């Protein structure tokens, strides 16, 4: 069968977006892995699926699958692309959209020239909300790594879980070495996304993220939210912060006790069609 799709990216975090309202397809783990292959498939960080919602307050249901086929709760760069996709495909004429995710409701607002502002919901900090193994909640935690190395982290759930550590320079940070250790650490029973943040000043940070089940990506929207919120909680950052990632910049806004707002661009790369039989086992 032929499957129509769209390739998009948010700051280099790239997606295959599939409308399963107007067409039908069964995409199992093995099929997703084959589609994600950058040599023999479409190639992407995540597959984004558009489905009818299960709850009356939502316009759409948004499902996210990593390149290894695992389903995850949230993707900040993805939800911006999702919002642009459903609008450009005329699945809705709304510019303010309510989207059901595995982590709850998010509300993207379409702006001009592909920019989207998203209500990302409330950040969560308690160990059982991450989840993270800890005796009691603390502002910062010490994580023991290999070779008697320790790092100080904050933990934030932005629809998916993040550990944030502050580094002197993101360019020289050992993301490839430390990232996998944090991601699969025994204190994170569902694994974790590891963020490495450099504070430039109170309105500007640089960030690299080693994503759970993916590895380091050019950008991570929920990671940018988690890092900014972590810095604000520590008293290092103002309530509106520019987060600079390898793929570009996001603006993150947060007030204590309120929702987090993320604003950033989207890019429509191309529309495609493929014979799904070649990717199924």
UniProtKB/Swiss-Prot annotation:
Indicate where this protein resides in the cell.
Cytoplasm
Which GO molecular function terms does the record list? diaminopimelate epimerase activity
An example GO CC term for this entry is: cytosol
| PANTHER family attached to this UniProt entry | DIAMINOPIMELATE EPIMERASE, DIAMINOPIMELATE EPIMERASE, CHLOROPLASTIC
Q: Which UniProt keywords apply?
A: Amino-acid biosynthesis, Cytoplasm, Isomerase, Lysine biosynthesis
Quick check: keyword Isomerase in the entry? yes
Give the EC number. 5.1.1.7
Q: Which family does it belong to?
A: Belongs to the diaminopimelate epimerase family.
Organism from which the protein derives: Acinetobacter baumannii (strain SDF)
Put simply, this protein is called Diaminopimelate epimerase
Q: Which residues bind substrate?
A: 13, 46, 66, 76-77, 160, 193, 211-212, 221-222
Site description Could be important to modulate the pK values of the two catalytic cysteine residues, residues in chain: 162, 211
What is the purpose of this protein?
Catalyzes the stereoinversion of LL-2,6-diaminopimelate (L,L-DAP) to meso-diaminopimelate (meso-DAP), a precursor of L-lysine and an essential component of the bacterial peptidoglycan.
Q: What lineage is on file?
A: Bacteria, Pseudomonadati, Pseudomonadota, Gammaproteobacteria, Moraxellales
Reactions catalysed:
(2S,6S)-2,6-diaminopimelate = meso-2,6-diaminopimelate
**Pfam families recorded:** DAP_epimerase (PF01678)
Sorted alphabetically, the Gene Ontology BP terms of this entry are: lysine biosynthetic process via diaminopimelate
Q: Which residues form the active site?
A: 75, 220
Q: Where is it chiefly localized?
A: cytoplasm
**Marked site (Important for dimerization) residue numbers:** 270
Task: Name its pathway.
Answer: Amino-acid biosynthesis; L-lysine biosynthesis via DAP pathway; DL-2,6-diaminopimelate from LL-2,6-diaminopimelate: step 1/1
HAMAP family in the record: DAP_epimerase
Q: What's the subunit arrangement here?
A: Homodimer.
